[in-house]
UniProtKB/Swiss-Prot annotation:
Induction: By blue light. The record marks Y218 as: Important for determining product chain length. Keywords: Carotenoid biosynthesis, Cytoplasm, Isoprene biosynthesis, Magnesium, Metal-binding, Transferase. One of its GO terms (biological process) is mycotoxin biosynthetic process. It comes from Neurospora crassa (strain ATCC 24698 / 74-OR23-1A / CBS 708.71 / DSM 1257 / FGSC 987). Its EC number is 2.5.1.-, 2.5.1.1, 2.5.1.29, 2.5.1.10. It is found in: Cytoplasm. This is Geranylgeranyl pyrophosphate synthase. The gene is al-3. Mg(2+) 1 binds at D186, D190. It is an enzyme of class 2 (transferase). It catalyses: isopentenyl diphosphate + dimethylallyl diphosphate = (2E)-geranyl diphosphate + diphosphate; isopentenyl diphosphate + (2E)-geranyl diphosphate = (2E,6E)-farnesyl diphosphate + diphosphate; isopentenyl diphosphate + (2E,6E)-farnesyl diphosphate = (2E,6E,10E)-geranylgeranyl diphosphate + diphosphate. Mg(2+) 2 binds at D186, D190.
Length: 433
């Protein structure tokens, strides 16, 4: 057994040298005999300036070999430290909110709060980068656009209302903003996983940020609306936003209390929730138009058609399954139009009600629920209701048009709804169109 004597000196206490803190292989810590030779016995240090006697098995390393190892490591460490400066250890780029190294600052002076004007326009620091942070979830969802039915509706009704182009641009933008913002909240409240075939915004940005963004966009839309300079605009906005939240509130209440509404309760809810944004756009257009045509009764019927058709497609449509997941309304526990009909067609059978209670993601259970609803005639009933409402909307469209030949846009929208429904039935029946 040979003994190697190493002189270890210590300076005053202070932060560890950079070479001790780095995990980079280029930074070699000073020779640590405990690490290199775990079996070595290091006696307690009694003085920072006294030699440390370490017993090392002679068959492991010689004193000459140890000295050579120390010298090589010291040279490598000095070379590495000389080549690598502190900034190279930091990220190569910084976002506006990454903490970059700052020079020492003088301590803050609390006396400045007695005199400084913190609210002057020159001190405001709201920037484009901050705006992007706030609108992140909204921009994300906008980056995966839907079918843009609402802007198509605006154009179709404008054939009768002839709204000035500047006003129409504002109205179209406001409706789009409100619709997208409402979807952000809907996905949170419904515990959705997919929207338009992509992960929902709150699964990426988090629930708090997504809710805040949605609320922010509501008020941003209100600010945008004031460009119309129409005293009726704000009143229309507040009335229909209240209706939207009333409808959504009842929908959530029925789901969370497992309360099956009546068909009339459902229709009232849809008129508020889905019809609200449809009416908002048309009422704003009428407020900016010189035409005396009242399109609100027609848009109310169209709102019913859209929501009932959406409920139907959620449980029946393959494309819907790809975009939002299989029978998402069943997983949510939602009392949709076919579900309400099925439950009330046989109140003594509690199976469907219990499936809703489970909020299941099991596809076999959901297939069973769909088969049960089919056995109660609920899908056939829903298809008939949609057709009756579409026929009613067509008649109302012709009454409004009164032979002027400006009803084509509305008829195209209604045609698309019926075609979509027929294609879904054909797919289910295994037919080829």
């Amino acid at each position: 057994m040979e003994h190697v004597t190493m002189a270890v000196t210590s300076s005053s206490p202070g932060p560890a040298p950079l070479s001790l803190l780095s995990n980079n292989d280029d930074f070699i810590a000073p020779f640590n005999i405990n690490t290199k030779f775990p079996s070595a016995i290091v006696p307690p240090r009694t003085s920072s300036n006294q030699p440390i006697s370490v017993a090392i098995p002679s068959n492991r390393i010689s004193s000459a070999g140890l000295a050579a190892t120390q010298q090589a490591q010291t040279r490598k460490r000095k070379a590495s430290v000389a080549q690598i400066s502190l900034p190279s250890m930091l990220p190569t780029s910084f976002s506006p909110y990454t903490m970059a190294p700052q020079p020492p600052q003088p301590p803050p002076n609390p006396d400045r709060f007695a005199t400084e004007d913190f609210f002057s326009p020159s001190r405001r620091t709201w920037s484009e980068e901050k705006e992007k942070v706030l609108t992140g979830p909204y921009d994300y969802l906008n980056g995966h656009p839907g079918k843009d039915i609402r802007s198509q509706m605006v154009k179709a009704f404008d054939a009768w209302l002839d709204v000035p182009s500047e006003s129409l641009e504002v109205i179209t933008k406001v409706i789009s903003m409100l619709h997208t913002a409402s979807l952000l909240v809907d996905d949170v409240e419904d515990n959705s996983v997919l929207r338009r075939g992509f992960p929902v915004a709150h699964s990426i940005f988090g629930i708090p940020q997504t809710i805040n963004t949605s609320n922010y966009v509501y008020f941003y839309a209100l600010q945008e609306l004031q460009k119309l300079k129409n005293p009726k605009a704000v009143s229309i906005f507040s009335e229909e936003l209240l209706n939207l939240h009333r409808g959504q509130g009842m929908d959530l209440f029925w789901r969370d209390t497992l309360t099956c509404p009546t068909e009339d309760d459902y229709l009232e809810m849809v008129s508020n929730k889905t019809g609200g944004l449809f009416r908002l756009g048309i009422k704003l257009m009428q407020a900016e138009s010189r035409s005396p045509v009242d399109c609100v009764p027609l848009v109310n019927i169209i709102g019913l058609i859209f929501q009932i058709a959406d409920d139907y497609h959620n449980l029946w449509n393959r494309e819907y399954t790809a975009n939002k997941g299989m029978c998402e309304d069943l997983t949510e526990g939602k009392f949709s139009f076919p579900v309400i009909h099925s439950i009330r067609s046989n109140p003594s059978n509690m199976q469907l009600l219990n499936i809703l209670k489970q909020k299941t993601g099991d596809e076999e259970v959901k297939r069973y629920a769909v088969a049960y609803m089919e056995s109660t005639g609920s899908f056939e009933y829903t298809r008939k209701v949609i057709k009756v409402l579409v026929d009613r909307a067509r008649q109302m469209t012709e009454d409004i048009d009164d032979g002027r030949g400006k009803s084509g846009g509305i008829h195209k929208i209604l045609d698309r709804i019926m075609l979509h429904q027929e294609e879904n039935v054909a797919q289910k029946n295994g037919k080829k169109e």
